[in-house]
Amino acid sequence: MQVLETISDLREYRKNVKESVGFVPTMGALHKGHQSLIERSLKENFHTITSVFVNPTQFGANEDFSAYPRPLEKDLALCEKLGVDVVFVPKISEMYPYKSEQRLKLYAPKFLSHSLEGAMRKGHFDGVAQVVLRLFHLVNPTRAYFGKKDAQQLLIIQHLVKDLLLDIEIVPCEIVRDSDHLALSSRNVYLNAVERKQALAIPKALENIQQAIDMGEKACEMLKKIGLEILKNLEVDYLEFCNHKLEPLKIIEPTNTLILVAARAGKTRLLDNLWV
């Protein structure tokens, strides 16, 4: 496995690769969710490149950029064990050669980015668009793998690829959960034992909503009440029912409904969702 830190080294590697390339962009602190993305890429491509880059432009002023976990040696060991070909670990100065005021500005499409996470974290998806498009430009992958847990991010990236005519297949991958059903996240390490137990209300709420849908309930208002009752001991930022354009729904639309939740257990903000 090669660990590349510079754009010039990555370009030199990529220039000599003619077969299919799978790409798994990450911010590190890898867990079994990331592992599932890497394993799928390894199955579907001749070469797999993973990036580890904590992207400063997607963090807000009061967010945890400096505190974000960075266990690089552990991440590299996992990638090598899995059989990754290249891990790209650039410095901020590599990815952003100009100061903020000198950069070309990229903006995520407002119709997908203004609500939900975009409303809670101003500029977050603009930062995601900045880094993902830069990485796509450098890696030029055949396929790129993203988890469904960050559903709004996934929809935005799918839109950007189509809108900018990029020849990249975006592969959505299922949410990976721990044995207690909590969706895997790098931020789960912040939870103490009590908070983790409280956080289990999030997958429980989604499970109960799914059960109600299976029993015939289609009214989003009623389903939301079911979910909020289970989430009552958490600080809920939102529990919303949308179609795949993130437009609010009143009635469940089969194969075109996303149920998204963001809530805090202690100080840790957690996301989860259900694709119906």
From Swiss-Prot:
Catalyzes the condensation of pantoate with beta-alanine in an ATP-dependent reaction via a pantoyl-adenylate intermediate. Beta-alanine binds at residue 58. The reaction proceeds by a bi uni uni bi ping pong mechanism. GO terms for molecular function: ATP binding; pantoate-beta-alanine ligase activity. Keywords: ATP-binding, Cytoplasm, Ligase, Nucleotide-binding, Pantothenate biosynthesis. Gene3D superfamilies: HUPs, Pantoate-beta-alanine ligase, C-terminal domain. HAMAP family: PanC. It comes from Helicobacter acinonychis (strain Sheeba). This is Pantothenate synthetase.
